[in-house]
Structures are given as C-alpha cells and as structure tokens.
Regions:
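Short, flexible, basic/aromatic active-site loop/helix in glycosyltransferases
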Residues: 131, 147-170
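Short beta-strand-to-loop acidic/aromatic patch adjacent to the donor-nucleotide binding site
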Residues: 92-103
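Glycine-rich, basic loop-to-helix element that forms the pyrophosphate-binding segment
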Residues: 69-88
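A short, conserved alpha-helix in the catalytic core of glycosyltransferases
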Residues: 171-179, 183-188, 193-221
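Active-site donor/metal-binding and catalytic loop motifs
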Residues: 217-234, 248
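Acidic donor-binding segment of Leloir-type glycosyltransferases
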Residues: 29-69
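Short, well-formed alpha-helical segments that are part of the catalytic scaffolds
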Residues: 17-30
Length: 320
C-alpha cells in the first residue's frame, strides 16, 4: 500500500523585496520535493502577488492572501499567522516558513518534511530550524577567499543528517523553520501584539517553552539569506524595537534585544524612564499605542537580536 506524504506548505510574507521573492521561487522550483502549497502573504503590496503568480509553476497550489499595515507598521506576526491559517485551510499538515530573503537549498523541503513526519505525536510541540547562511555584499569577498555565504556564529551548520535539541529557545529565528500544523496551533502562533520589527521571534520561543515544547536544529535543510543592506544596530527600526521591547517585558518580565537598546541609548536615540520602560527620545514610542516608525521594506529578521534576562523594574510575569 502506498503511503501518501502529509501535505506540506511553504509560507512566506513580503512587502517589497520582489527580486528576493523571485530568488526564493527559483530555489523552490529546484527542490527535489517541491511544496504542495505555496502561500505568499502580501503586506500592503499587491505587486508581491503579481510576482508570485508570474513565476510559480502552474501545478503549484498557490495561495495569495494579503493584509495591510496597522497604524503604519508592519504586522509581521499577524501576516505569518494568516499564512499558516491559509495553508491549513488548504489541507497542509506540515508548515515550512521561509523569510522572503531566503533561498532554500535543494533538499530543504524534503528534509523538513522528513523530520516532521518523524514527530512522535506525543509530548509537547516541536519546532525545527535549519541553518541559514548570509550572502555577502556584492562588492565584498565574503568570509573566505571563495566569497561563499557566511553562517552566523551562533548558528554554525550541522552535518546533513544531524538533529540537535536546543535548550535556549531564544535562539529561535523565523528566517527558516518548520512545524506541524497541530503544533503551530498548540504553541498559539505568533503574538499579534507585536507590530513592526523586533521581539516577535523571541516571544514565539517563549510560547514554545511555555507549551512544553522543544526547539530542534537540523542539518540538510539549509538556506541562503540574500543580501540587502541593513545597519547594525538597526536604527531604522528604533521606534518599533522600543515599542515591542516594552510589550515583551510586560508579558515575560525581562528585556529582549538588550544590546540593541543599550546601543540606541549610547547614540542618544532612547532612554529609560523612571518606571523602567524604554522610550525614544522624541517620545514617539512610549508603548503599543505609539505612532511607530514609517513603513520600511520587510527586514530579514537578522536575527542578531541579543537577548537579556536582566531583571527589569517591571513585575516578572509567571509562565502559565
């Protein structure tokens, strides 16, 4: 009897980055096993759907939901949740999330599908992350003489057959990960209180831990993050980062992105209020109702976001 593999969806979200989306589609077309469903969520950018429709093969089940900005800010969490619900509605049991900047290696879809199919079906949810290498700037030679993409030092590549459990859930990055539809629902998806850039990945890791789940790093599911310029620290997102850091600290009782916040402070961009909260020096981001930053193209989630469990002056929120 032939056993049919569970239906697998690749989900990406995009605003701008049309050339990078085209690169991702080329990478998906080169897979040994392609996606059964391809979900491309456009954020305030109808051209994203045009690119996906023009370049995706006719035999793919292409789904193209969309969402707008919220208070002038990018609803990254809500867009990912919309992508997941669209994929599940199309019958997908396995979900692979790829940042729009990421081009999958030829074995990524098959490897993620293999790992998810081996899920025990009991215990807490599992989230699986493959490694991501970063394409160097076109004018620079890269890390080595061959100019090949470089891996983040916190995420060195694993052998193709390796599976490694990771205790530090703050190492979860949404650039490339896979999860069963059931486990995504058990985690609760991404928290939609976060708007714009920053902290939503760290929050998802905390949700995974709270649900009794496990983070796994695997080999054989690599991707390449296509280059785009991004300053460090990401000063273009300072307002979003301050708002989202406060949201996170209210919820979890410790500060994410501590290094970035301190670097912003050293540059005179932010300060700590007497109550312990962070605020931009123009007062633009005192909390989640602040005006936020002007919209920017979708960032590739660095995610060099440093996290810190330094206790804030806010009350620690107990994990449920």
């Amino acid at each position: 009897m032939t056993v049919t593999a569970p239906r697998l969806a690749v989900v990406t979200i995009a605003r701008g980055r049309h050339a990078h989306l085209a690169g991702q589609i080329r990478g998906l077309r080169a897979q040994g096993r392609g996606p059964d469903v391809y979900v491309v969520v456009a954020i305030d950018d109808p051209q994203v759907h045009d690119v996906a429709g023009r370049l995706s093969p006719a035999d793919w089940d292409l789904r193209r939901p969309g969402t707008g900005l919220r208070d002038g800010r990018m609803p990254l969490s809500a867009a990912r949740n919309l992508g997941a619900s669209t994929a599940i509605g199309a019958g997908a049991e396995h979900l692979v999330f790829l940042d729009v900047d990421c081009v999958p290696n030829p074995t990524l879809v098959a490897r993620y599908g293999e790992i998810l199919a081996d899920a025990p079906g009991v215990g807490g949810p599992r989230v699986v992350c493959g490694d991501v290498a970063y394409e160097p700037p076109p004018s620079l030679p890269g890390a080595g003489a061959d100019g090949r993409p470089r891996h983040h030092p916190a995420r060195p590549p694993l052998p193709a057959s390796a599976v490694r459990a990771v205790e530090d859930v703050s190492l979860f990055w949404s650039l490339s990960f896979a999860v069963t539809a059931r486990d995504f629902t058990r985690v609760g998806g991404f928290d939609e209180d976060y708007l714009g850039y920053g902290a939503e990945d760290t929050d998802f890791g905390q949700r995974l831990a709270r649900s009794g789940g496990q983070l796994l790093f695997v080999g054989g599911a690599g991707a390449v993050h296509q280059y785009h310029p991004s300053p460090s620290p990401p000063v273009q997102h300072v307002a979003d980062i301050v708002v989202n850091a406060n949201v996170f600290a209210d919820k979890w009782g410790w500060w994410p992105m501590q290094t970035w916040l301190e670097q912003f402070r050293d540059r005179g961009l932010v300060h700590r209020r007497l109550d312990g909260r962070w605020e931009t020096n123009d007062g633009a981001a005192p909390g989640p109702d602040g005006p936020g930053a002007a919209p920017a193209p979708l960032e590739g989630a660095a995610r060099g976001q440093a996290t810190s469990r330094t206790t804030s002056t806010l009350p620690r929120v107990a994990l449920e």
